[in-house]
């Protein structure tokens, strides 16, 4: 426990590797935020099973995601980095919160409406419907003051705030009412082949996705083949030049240099030179992450030790909040012997 503001965030273990969009859009910013926050970062495997998962693959993806968190700079001795299912209080609090969530309230969640419309009623699980309630439990368990999320998750944080205020009003002050911390606008990375679409593991083609664990030569080929346009001018114009603008955003995020500076560097030069420069930046940034991830995966006992220690720390914090909620709602608590 520190005097720093409490922060909670997480990502699903939904692929063998996280991608560049995950890194720039979340991990890179988490790394910066952990220095000034009492941070809890979770691999949210309970959320992952709202769609069908192969059990062996889920375990492997969970381990690989945790390793990439660490390799990308999340320090498990500074932040609490754990696997969601290792802390049973997540599911316990989610049930309590579901009893004060209105059906219409849950049905209005945009992500549920979009995904259920694509999948159809028969293929849509109750778990997907109640996903935002579990997310609320994730946040409220740790008395999070701030929740760094993309703009597409803002609605879920608003629901979390509503549930916290509703519970507090009915049962007495129990939960901290969190604030959404919307991540930087420039942090959204788009598909290299379809730069109008966000980089996503569910893309039709893997050619537009740079994975953190891609070998350098694979990453180079993807960048050199990235969609641009025909005018040959390296300049940022999200509406008119989405492909080049996306590459400039990547260059800026990974190099720490302003887009305007990069534009000046490549003034009068073609896209070939620009892409070659970007390849160097990407390989320099992602190479150490790939190497460290592979080291961690080669020593599963050490990775398990880290995760177990952090889960114990997370569990202690979560149990305090859960006990307060149980007491407030009127559950008969077991007698300690």
UniProtKB/Swiss-Prot annotation:
Q: Map motif 'HIGH' region onto the chain.
A: 13-22
PROSITE patterns attached here? AA_TRNA_LIGASE_I
Any GO BP:
tryptophanyl-tRNA aminoacylation
Which amino acids does the record list as binding ATP? 12-14, 21-22, 150-152, 189, 198-202
Q: Which residues bind L-tryptophan?
A: 138
Q: Which UniProt keywords apply?
A: Aminoacyl-tRNA synthetase, ATP-binding, Cytoplasm, Ligase, Nucleotide-binding, Protein biosynthesis
* Cellular localisation: Cytoplasm
Motif 'KMSKS' region, chain ranges = 198-202
Q: Which CDD domains match?
A: TrpRS_core (cd00806)
Whether Transmembrane helix counts among this entry's keywords is no
Q: Which reaction does it catalyse?
A: tRNA(Trp) + L-tryptophan + ATP = L-tryptophyl-tRNA(Trp) + AMP + diphosphate + H(+)
Q: Which PANTHER family match?
A: TRYPTOPHAN--TRNA LIGASE, MITOCHONDRIAL
NCBIfam families in the record: trpS
Q: What is this protein called?
A: Tryptophan--tRNA ligase
Q: Which gene encodes it?
A: trpS
């Amino acid at each position: 426990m520190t005097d720093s503001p409490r922060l909670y965030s997480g990502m699903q273990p939904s692929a063998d590797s996280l991608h560049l969009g995950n890194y720039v859009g979340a991990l890179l910013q988490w790394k910066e935020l952990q220095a000034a926050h009492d941070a809890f970062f979770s691999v949210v495997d309970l959320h992952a099973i709202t769609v069908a998962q192969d059990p062996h693959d889920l375990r492997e993806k969970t381990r690989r995601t945790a390793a990439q968190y660490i390799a990308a700079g999340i320090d498990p001795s500074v932040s609490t980095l754990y696997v969601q299912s290792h802390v049973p209080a997540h599911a316990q609090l989610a049930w309590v919160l579901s009893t004060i969530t209105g059906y219409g309230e849950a049905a209005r969640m945009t992500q549920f409406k979009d995904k259920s419309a694509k999948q159809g009623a028969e293929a849509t699980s109750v778990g997907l419907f109640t996903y935002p309630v579990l997310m609320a439990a994730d946040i409220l368990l740790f008395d999070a003051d701030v929740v760094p999320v993309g703009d597409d998750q803002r609605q879920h944080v608003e629901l979390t705030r509503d549930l916290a205020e509703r519970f507090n009003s009915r049962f007495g002050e129990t939960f901290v009412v969190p604030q959404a911390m919307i991540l930087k606008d420039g942090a959204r990375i788009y598909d290299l082949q379809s730069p109008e679409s966000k980089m996503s593991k569910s893309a039709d083609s893997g050619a537009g996705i740079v994975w953190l664990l891609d070998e350098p030569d694979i990453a180079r080929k993807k960048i050199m083949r990235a969609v641009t346009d025909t005018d040959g001018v390296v300049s940022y114009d999200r509406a008119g030049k989405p492909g080049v603008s996306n590459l400039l955003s990547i260059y800026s995020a990974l190099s720490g240099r302003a887009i305007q500076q990069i534009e000046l560097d490549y003034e009068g030069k073609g896209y070939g030179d620009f892409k070659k420069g970007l390849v160097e930046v990407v390989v320099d940034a992602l190479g150490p992450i790939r190497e460290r991830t592979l080291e961690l995966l080669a020593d599963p006992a050490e990775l398990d030790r880290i995760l177990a220690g952090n889960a114990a720390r997370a569990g202690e914090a979560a149990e305090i909040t859960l006990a307060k909620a149980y007491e407030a709602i009127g559950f008969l608590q077991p007698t300690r012997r």
